[in-house]
């Protein structure tokens, strides 16, 4: 950064007024970031600078910057500053909707946001601030990671390892962590971004990978651009590595704010109640007709969820990954809840490996932040076939069952239609030998160890094959067993607390969530482990 060659820097012993002037001068140099040309390049790429991001994200005039004078300075023999390069990380604290957060982000205009131009004490300050004061941690990631030029400058190649991840992992067990992937991100910055409870990237503007296209091309011969290698189409729609996508940086900011609004400040607290004007005893008439009479016909599960929750507001996470399962946050009676449902429009709602992993992560997230869970179950079972077997679907499903079993937060389940087999046991898991999760049924409910069609084909195979008319005999057996699937019979055996009018779903769910509050407060301070991405 150019320095006025005629400027006489303040020295110890000189007047305080000159010291204050010097402080302001250094701060002004830091705010120039990488200079006008690099700022213009950032804007030409339709991206904000890190200082603009922080200003737009936080409440007006709420940002308190930490380390506003941090940078690499050089001085001559007379003690006058001759060079100054601002640090590539801007950090501090501020407010979102009046709530304190620790915040930091990479300055891509300086060395591409490389961590080698970030003072270690500065980069760790926001982590320590969030941990000590128990406030959410927000990071805007736009850094390229390690550079071979750094090795050459150092004169050696360092051995990876050490404890650089310790505080970030501790954060994941103590406070909410959210990250915006704001540009091309690789190496350690990518890993830090993924060590978050919520991640969002910008369509067409953000990419994330261990190494970028030049390294991939040299190592594997794959000729891909950044978007093909690690854009939103890859990591939001396919791999599930990133939770959500946004059309703009402003939308990404709003998603992060929405995510944080459902969580408490720490994992040892319960999210506060938010007042609203949606009556807890509201009876949505559409719930009575949302389920088709024909059991094989689909319906809109997101519409179902929005009809039940407060004001129809549902914050969905990982919509495109494991798409047969729906996960997200909402409120009932003003209280935050985790919501799980099935999408019959994707794999008929069956659990494949990706959906199982999605559930495992989400139930861990709800358990860590003491959110009761509301489940709208329409689970026909595990996805079948050779492709499902090659993806270790059942092993991943068992992991989901274990995660559900270990979760201590209470659950209420509405069996809106199908509930079959081990796959349905994941949300049904009671958590303890005498655990109690509340289960209700809708009139469309049907459940069992195996769907009738498949069960008949397996259990009655020889009888069917030996019949004069195998197809007619199979149909006869299926019709006989179909009479047994009436949810009335299950209710008579107390498989569910009750069969309910679907229009009463909201009222019952709100009663459950209110009932759960004292329990949540009692268990909130139990030890937590880092939520794994």
Please identify what each model-predicted range represents.
Residues 1-533:
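Ligand-binding clefts of soluble mixed alpha/beta catalytic domains
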């Amino acid at each position: 950064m150019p320095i006025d060659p005629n400027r006489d820097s303040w020295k110890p012993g000189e007047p305080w007024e000159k010291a204050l002037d010097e402080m302001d001068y250094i701060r002004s140099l830091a705010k120039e970031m990488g200079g006008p040309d690099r700022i213009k390049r950032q804007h030409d790429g339709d991206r904000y600078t890190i200082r603009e991001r922080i200003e737009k994200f936080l409440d007006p005039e709420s940002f308190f910057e930490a380390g506003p004078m941090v940078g690499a300075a050089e001085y001559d023999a007379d003690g006058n500053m001759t060079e100054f390069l601002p640090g590539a990380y801007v950090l501090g604290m501020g407010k979102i909707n009046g709530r304190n957060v620790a915040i930091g982000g990479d300055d891509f205009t300086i060395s591409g946001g490389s961590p080698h131009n970030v003072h270690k004490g500065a980069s760790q300050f926001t982590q320590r601030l969030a941990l000590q004061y128990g406030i959410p941690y927000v990071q805007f990631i736009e850094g390229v990671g390690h550079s071979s030029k750094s090795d050459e400058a150092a004169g050696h190649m360092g051995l990876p390892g050490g404890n650089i991840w310790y505080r970030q992992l501790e954060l994941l067990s103590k406070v909410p962590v959210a990250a915006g992937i704001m540009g091309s991100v690789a190496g350690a910055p990518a890993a830090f971004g993924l060590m978050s409870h919520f991640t969002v990237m910008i369509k067409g503007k953000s990419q994330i990978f261990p190494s970028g296209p030049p390294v991939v091309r040299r190592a594997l011969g794959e000729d891909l651009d950044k978007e093909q290698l690690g854009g939103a189409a890859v990591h939001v729609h396919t791999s599930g590595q990133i939770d959500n996508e946004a059309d703009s940086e402003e939308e990404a900011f709003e998603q992060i704010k929405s995510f944080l609004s459902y969580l408490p400040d720490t994992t040892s607290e319960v999210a506060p109640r938010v007042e609203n004007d949606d009556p807890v005893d509201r009876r949505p008439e559409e719930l009575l007709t949302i389920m088709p009479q024909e059991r094989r016909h689909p319906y809109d599960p997101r519409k179902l969820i929005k009809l039940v929750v407060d004001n129809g507001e549902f914050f969905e996470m990982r919509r495109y990954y494991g798409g047969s399962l729906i996960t997200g946050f909402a409120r009932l009676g003003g209280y935050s809840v985790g919501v799980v449902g099935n999408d019959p429009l994707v794999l008929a709602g069956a659990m494949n490996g990706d959906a199982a992993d999605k559930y495992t992560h989400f139930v861990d997230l709800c358990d860590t932040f003491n959110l009761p869970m509301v489940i709208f179950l329409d689970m026909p079972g595990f996805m079948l076939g050779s492709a499902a077997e090659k993806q270790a679907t059942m092993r991943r499903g068992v992991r989901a069952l274990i995660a559900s079993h270990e979760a201590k937060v209470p659950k209420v389940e509405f069996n809106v239609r199908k509930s079959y087999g081990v796959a349905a046991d994941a949300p049904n898991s009671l958590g303890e030998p005498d655990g109690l999760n509340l289960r209700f049924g809708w009139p469309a409910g049907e459940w069992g160890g195996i769907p009738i069609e498949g069960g008949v084909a397996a259990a009655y195979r020889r009888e069917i094959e030996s019949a004069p008319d195998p197809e007619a005999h199979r149909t006869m057996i299926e019709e006989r067993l179909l009479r047994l699937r009436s949810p009335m019979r299950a209710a008579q055996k107390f498989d569910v607390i009750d069969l309910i009018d679907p229009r009463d779903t909201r009222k019952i769910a709100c009663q459950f969530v209110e009932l759960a509050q004292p329990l949540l407060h009692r268990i909130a301070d139990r030890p937590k482990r880092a939520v794994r991405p």
